[in-house]
Amino acid sequence: MCSIGEDDFGDTGGLHAMTAGGPVQIATGGTGECQKCGQHSDDLFKVNFRSEECRDCFLNYARHKFRAALGAAKALPRDSDVLLLLDGSIESIVLLDMLHYAQTQNTFKRLHCQAKVLYLDESVVQEQQSLDIDRLQKLQDRYTPFDLFVIELGTDLSNLRPLKNYTPKTSREESDLKIKLDKLRTLSARQDYLQQQRKRFLASVAHQLNCTHVFVPSISKDLATQFLTSIALGRGGSAALDVALCDDRLDHDIKLLRPLKDLNEQEVQLYVRARNLEDLKLGPSLATYGQEKGETASLQNLTAAFVRNLQENYAATVSTVFRTGNKIAPNRHVDQDMCQQCQSPLDSLLSDTLLAIEYSRVVSLEGSKLSNHNNDLEQLSMQRLNKDDRLCHACRNVQDEYL
């Protein structure tokens, strides 16, 4: 079975890379002999911890990571119906290019699945100009015969349209999703709530299009950030699924797959150069939601800044962080109920830590009134913990942020 060696990522304990250095450099290319195939090349590609190689050898290496991620875990059954998320990021275009290449190979090497592409118009949340249909049409023309669908985030599924039948709205009413976001007091709560709603919306669209799997373009840097963010937000019990290849918590038994999880930022940029891909800047992406408010505006922004600093100075550490998440088993029990918001296992009955957190919160809010009544403090703590037993700890915190 196809697999990926740890040496591909420079993770031999991380010891060889644990010295501070400058920002990751993207080589501009040069001429010489490919160290992989021995052929002369006018445009060499240099990935950290690998020898210089020609364009074809580099593309084989990058595409191997994509295929190996899916093949090693047998995560994608043969002839599955797949929905690929195109979110406007360059990573999503790389994922589209890799999937198209895998679909157009001969029978032996072909990735046997039926793929559709979804562009999720997120401008309704970002309050920015809607997408450029002409640019999206160029993308569909390049990646024929994939069917491309478009829908605005948070709208009714009846608005799902093939690209040829889609017309951007010149004026729009404020969506229910935007109204709910505006009622949340903190940016951390808004970003967390938006991420959960986006996953549920993707599952609904996939179900509407009769797809059983969803491809998302998360790379190692994104997953390292997500892993640390999940822990900081109180989602430690489900953090492993937030960074795993396969997340099976979605509605309608839809499985969310991250086939680019083993690619880093440098490899993505080199792949863009090798394939002459263009960042079409299709529209705003949720990856940038709230970033304009600064690094300290939310836990998510602060964590992303921390991981970027690691990427610049300790390149191999980012891979180590998200691989740590892969080694953590999800906290699941057969008879355990699931959170109605994020579909993670409910954790309120499994940990005394949550009771201690609520106790501290009650002391802060009611301590001056109940200083001589410890039993009352404990009772209030239990009431807060059980006031909505359908939500996990993190989603309950989001609910507490509503104005």
UniProtKB/Swiss-Prot annotation:
Gene Ontology terms, MF aspect: nucleotidyltransferase activity; sulfurtransferase activity; tRNA binding
- Indicate where this protein resides in the cell: Cytoplasm
Q: Which UniProt keywords apply?
A: Cytoplasm, tRNA processing
> Pathway, according to UniProt?
tRNA modification; 5-methoxycarbonylmethyl-2-thiouridine-tRNA biosynthesis
SUPFAM superfamilies in UniProt: Adenine nucleotide alpha hydrolases-like
The lineage's top-level taxon is: Eukaryota
One Pfam family from the UniProt entry?
CTU2
Main subcellular localisation: cytoplasm
For this UniProt entry, what's an example GO CC term?
Answer: cytosol
Q: Which GO terms describe its biological process?
A: protein urmylation; tRNA thio-modification; tRNA wobble position uridine thiolation; tRNA wobble uridine modification
Role summary:
Plays a central role in 2-thiolation of mcm(5)S(2)U at tRNA wobble positions of tRNA(Lys), tRNA(Glu) and tRNA(Gln). May act by forming a heterodimer with NCS6/CTU1 that ligates sulfur from thiocarboxylated URM1 onto the uridine of tRNAs at wobble position.
Describe the family membership recorded for this protein in Swiss-Prot or TrEMBL.
Belongs to the CTU2/NCS2 family.
> What is this protein identified as?
Cytoplasmic tRNA 2-thiolation protein 2
Q: Which organism is it from?
A: Drosophila willistoni
